[in-house]
């Protein structure tokens, strides 16, 4: 595709995140995880890092809170139209869910740095003609529905995301999983690499943000088997993701060469929660230019030239 031409020429790092916050009109974020993902993308563009990001289109958003006349809080869909901001790709791929072929298409949005670089973001969409009605809704809501809905989304993000990058022609040398939602990408990579875990580990990086056990996705193998159905795949998930239930974080950690938490303290808590894994600490940051008001930008421009390239000058 013409709008991806420059990105396809480079060896890319693929950054997978269930939510990404890029602009308020594109409601594919719920909170901090999406905000941080957006800032990673912005910083990568500033530094001209060859990154491509993958997420779900979530065209009905997370939810929008409204107070009714009685003062009660109510939630409503936060719908947006991808065609206003993005380009629809011609390529389609398929994933198996309950032994059905579910077709995926992709929208592309390119974030352009105020300096020089850019990062393409791939938004996966199951609202494709020919899919069953329930399958067309998989990418409607961010974190919507129950465990079944969530696991379907994670199949689309992880397995479908890898397949879409291949279909679009990206040459990926590293896969970065931002939380366990995308961990099923490692299953797809295992199958592409003769089930060799060492080859997959060399390809994968995992970042965990969640300091409590309840925050990590876990799925009963009855549900996993019902949706994935391939017995060999389910056995792979048991081998690397836990025997009693499928823990997406354990699966990601067992198949990653590098694991990090998001502060020193958080890495210590995560190491205690998941003993036996070396969890490094990379402190969360923000893309300072984005979150600095125009008034302060002018002030910094006057007294701290080039602060947008070296934000530590403002500290």
Predicted regions and their residues:
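Catalytic cores of carbohydrate-active enzymes across secretory and cytosolic contexts
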Residues: 1-315
């Amino acid at each position: 595709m013409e709008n991806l031409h420059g990105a396809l020429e480079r060896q890319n790092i693929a950054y997978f995140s269930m939510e990404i916050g890029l602009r308020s009109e594109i409601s594919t974020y719920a909170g901090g995880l999406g905000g941080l993902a957006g800032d990673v993308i912005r910083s990568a563009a500033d530094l001209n890092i060859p990154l491509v990001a993958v997420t779900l289109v979530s065209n009905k958003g997370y939810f929008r809170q409204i107070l009714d006349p009685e003062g009660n809080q109510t939630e409503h869909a936060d719908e947006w139209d991808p065609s206003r901001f993005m380009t629809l790709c011609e390529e389609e791929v398929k994933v198996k869910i309950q032994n059905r072929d579910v077709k995926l298409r992709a929208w592309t949005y390119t974030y352009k740095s105020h300096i020089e670089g850019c990062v393409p973001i791939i938004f996966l969409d199951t609202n494709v003609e020919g899919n069953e009605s329930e399958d067309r809704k998989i990418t409607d809501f961010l974190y919507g529905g129950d465990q079944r809905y969530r696991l379907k989304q994670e199949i689309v993000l992880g397995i479908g995301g890898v397949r879409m990058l291949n279909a679009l022609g990206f040459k990926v040398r590293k896969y970065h999983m931002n939380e366990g939602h995308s961990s099923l990408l490692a299953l797809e990579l295992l199958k592409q690499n003769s089930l060799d875990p060492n080859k997959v580990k060399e390809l994968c990086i995992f970042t965990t943000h969640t300091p409590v056990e309840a925050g990590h996705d876990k799925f009963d193998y009855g549900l996993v088997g019902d949706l994935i159905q391939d017995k060999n795949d389910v056995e792979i998930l048991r081998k690397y993701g836990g025997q009693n239930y499928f823990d997406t974080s354990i699966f990601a950690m067992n198949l990653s060469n590098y694991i990090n938490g998001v502060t020193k303290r958080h890495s210590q808590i995560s190491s205690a929660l998941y003993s036996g894994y070396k969890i490094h600490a990379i402190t969360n940051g923000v893309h300072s230019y984005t979150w600095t008001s125009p008034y302060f930008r002018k002030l910094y421009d006057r007294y701290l030239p080039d602060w947008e390239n070296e934000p530590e000058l403002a500290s």
